[in-house]
């Protein structure tokens, strides 16, 4: 009798576990590639924000200061978008951290003479946005996690606009 009761209890417990819905985030877990994307996108945004904050104070040309303000707003927003998408895809990302090359570029900006600042800032923005564009395009095409892929695709036109604007401003002296 005890054996039959145990079997029935075990069968009931298994059925109960199978009936409990699994949260959507747990069903769509993403892996290492997603974390790398989130980390690189966050680092790129952090660099853009910090470099542009410096440009709002040091740039001589008003067009460069306006460009910097746009970058601060847009990259702050994209950081939030990527973080929300990562959470939707079941990740718990760490706060962004600058890469070594980005820290070096910020040090170069800090050390630049006032008359050289605009040129140096814009010369950094072009390759930084080329890299960012490649990152977001690639992830939008082949990345893990539907929310992160969609977000990467939404960020692409913003980065394209930044790159075009940086190229427009760069030849101006």
At which residue positions do the language-model features occur?
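His/Met- and acidic-residue-enriched segments that coordinate or traffic transition-metal cofactors
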Residues: 2-10, 19-173
């Amino acid at each position: 009798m005890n054996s039959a009761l145990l079997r029935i209890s075990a069968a009931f417990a298994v059925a109960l576990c199978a009936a409990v819905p699994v949260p959507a985030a747990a069903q769509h877990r993403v892996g290492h590639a997603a974390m790398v994307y989130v980390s690189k996108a966050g680092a790129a945004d952090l660099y853009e924000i910090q470099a542009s904050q410096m440009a709002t104070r040091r740039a001589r040309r008003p067009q460069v200061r306006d460009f910097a303000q746009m970058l601060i707003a847009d990259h702050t927003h994209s950081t939030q978008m990527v973080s929300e998408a990562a959470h939707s895809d079941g990740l718990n990302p760490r706060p962004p951290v600058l890469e070594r090359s980005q820290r070096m570029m910020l040090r170069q900006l800090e050390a630049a003479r006032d008359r050289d600042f605009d040129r140096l800032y814009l010369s950094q923005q072009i390759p930084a946005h080329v890299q960012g564009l490649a990152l977001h395009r690639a992830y939008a095409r082949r990345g893990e996690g539907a929310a992160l892929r969609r977000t990467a695709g939404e960020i692409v036109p913003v980065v394209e606009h930044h790159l075009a604007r940086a190229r427009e401003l760069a030849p101006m002296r």
